[in-house]
A protein has these predicted regions:
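Active-site nucleophile and cofactor-binding loops and adjacent substrate-binding regions
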Residues: 42-45, 66-74
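Structural motif
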Residues: 38, 67, 97-99
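Flexible, glycine-rich active-site loops centered on histidine and acidic residues
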Residues: 2-15, 72-134
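Ser/Thr-centric signal marking residues that sit
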Residues: 59, 66, 85
């Protein structure tokens, strides 16, 4: 049987904390393999890693993942520490999906140049891996 995961789009104005917890519990109860959240800066969704921390506290088995985290907008050392902490509180159930974004509006919102985002993402992923292993 294939692994099935469900994504939580997390629109901030409509989301309540109990929605996140209930969604995570339902995913697990239905036998889903994973629960995923999205990341956007220039959109009204909630911060995905914090939502996954809530889901970690409400579940025991499902994997928790980002689909995808805009990993080159925040500082990579900060992302690495948050993901390591999430891995700790979830007993290693984290899958980190990182992208470099296709929407210039996310970059404009935080005043980071849109150009060269791919090469920046490669450098930042390397830094995070180093922080997790050294």
């Amino acid at each position: 049987m294939p692994n099935i995961g469900l994504a939580w789009v997390n629109p901030a104005p409509l989301t309540k904390p109990e929605h996140v917890v209930n969604f995570a519990k339902q995913c697990e109860a239905m036998g889903c393999h994973s629960m995923w959240t999205i990341d956007r800066v220039a959109y009204d969704n909630l911060e995905p890693l914090t939502l996954l921390a809530m889901a970690a506290g409400a579940t025991q088995r499902i994997r928790l993942g980002t689909s995808v985290l805009l990993g080159n907008l925040p500082h990579p050392s900060h992302v690495a520490k948050i993901v390591a902490t999430l891995g700790f509180i979830s007993n290693g159930r984290v899958t980190l999906g990182i992208g470099f974004g296709s929407r210039e509006s996310d970059y404009k919102a935080v005043e980071i140049p849109f150009e060269h985002r791919g090469s920046r993402a490669v450098e930042q992923i390397a830094l995070m891996k180093r922080l997790w292993t050294e």
